[in-house]
């Protein structure tokens, strides 16, 4: 794509701005101010919570006409829809292509779905189907796509809401497969900055996977940082719960046979993908340098832990 075309990429539509990931993407665009942002919402009941200068359009995700109308004139579609709404993304992609949207960034922001083991997990079937749809649609149109993989979202994983690694209320830290394996992890703020950076590097990020991380760290290293942050708070010592991700996957498969994608099913496959060796959770290559993502060190991770453990941090993650 020529440079003069990239300079004309200005109008961005964001779906899912009220969710946790979407709220951080929204914040990044508000800080950036180089792009004109439009929010796609199911209803306008919480419109007062959005910045007044941002356009908000109510859409019907079951109506192609509604989606195409909302996306006309948009250069970029960013989806931050949560797992409960992932089935809507196929219609969003069809509408974006019909509206001649130049770049489509779907709701990924997680596991490395280029890993063949992780790619087989049934909980990622909708995302993989959408990736295939994007590849086909963009090959036959003027649209392009970017898939953003972040592996484990650090603030979510250590929050009371996520509880993937830490259960703060029980003073419990979960160690998967011994806890010595390094895994890639990314903060929610960096997810937002990455989306903006992808548009700033429009040509270099077209029709490809982007992998970013704030740090590659072991769970044991993270546990030590949690202990340092909480050392003076007067609380009890941290307990450790050892979990085998192979067992978690087995339990997820057994639960899946009962016919429902329950939280236990999602959890079992998620921890296997994020923390088990050989499942792509420790990125072999990252695109941080291309996008200007600097990453964070021990002190910054400790500041993040301190914030997430605070009342303000818990409230920010309560979407």
Predicted regions and their residues:
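A hydrophobic C-terminal alpha-helical subdomain
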Residues: 246-319
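N-terminal Rossmann-like NAD(P) cofactor-binding module of classical short-chain dehydrogenase/reductase
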Residues: 71, 75-80, 105
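ADP-ribose/adenylate-binding Rossmann-like module
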Residues: 95, 100-111
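Conserved Rossmann-fold cofactor-binding substructure of NAD(P)-dependent oxidoreductases
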Residues: 55-74
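Oxidoreductase cofactor-interface core, primarily capturing Rossmann-like NAD(P)-dependent enzymes
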Residues: 2-51, 62-65, 86-87, 99, ...
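N-terminal glycine-rich "phosphate-gripper" loop used for MgATP/nucleotide binding
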Residues: 81-90
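Short, amphipathic alpha-helical "lid/cap" segments that border enzyme active or binding sites
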Residues: 68, 188-196, 298-306
């Amino acid at each position: 794509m020529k440079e003069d075309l990239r300079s004309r990429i200005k109008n961005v539509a964001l779906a899912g701005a009220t969710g946790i990931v979407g709220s951080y993407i929204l914040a990044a665009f508000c800080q950036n101010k180089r792009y004109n942002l439009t929010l796609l919402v199911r209803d306008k009941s919480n419109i007062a919570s959005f910045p007044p200068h941002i356009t908000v359009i109510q859409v019907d995700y079951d109506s192609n006409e509604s989606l195409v109308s909302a996306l006309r004139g948009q250069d970029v579609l960013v989806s931050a829809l949560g797992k409960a709404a992932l089935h809507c993304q196929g219609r969003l992609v069809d509408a974006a292509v019909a509206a001649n949207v130049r770049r489509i960034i779907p709701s990924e922001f997680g596991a490395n779905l280029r890993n063949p083991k992780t790619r087989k997990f049934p909980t990622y079937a909708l995302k993989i189907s959408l990736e295939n749809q994007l590849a086909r649609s963009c090959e036959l149109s003027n649209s392009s796509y970017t898939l953003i993989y972040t592996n484990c979202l650090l603030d979510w994983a250590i929050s009371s809401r996520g509880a993937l690694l830490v259960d703060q209320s029980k003073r419990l830290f979960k160690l998967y497969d011994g806890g010595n394996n390094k895994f890639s992890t990314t903060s929610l703020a960096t997810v937002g900055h990455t989306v903006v950076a992808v548009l700033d590097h429009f040509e270099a990020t077209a029709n490809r996977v982007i992998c970013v991380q704030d740090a590659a760290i072991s769970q044991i290293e993270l546990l030590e940082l949690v202990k340092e942050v909480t050392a003076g708070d007067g609380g009890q010592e941290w307990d450790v719960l050892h979990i085998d991700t192979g067992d978690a996957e087995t339990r997820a498969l057994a639960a899946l046979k009962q016919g429902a994608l329950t939280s236990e099913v999602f959890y079992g496959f998620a921890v296997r993908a994020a923390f088990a060796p050989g499942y792509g959770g420790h990125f072999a290559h990252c695109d941080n340098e291309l996008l200007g993502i600097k990453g964070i060190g021990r002190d910054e991770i400790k500041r993040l832990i301190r914030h997430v453990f605070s009342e303000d941090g818990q409230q920010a993650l309560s979407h």
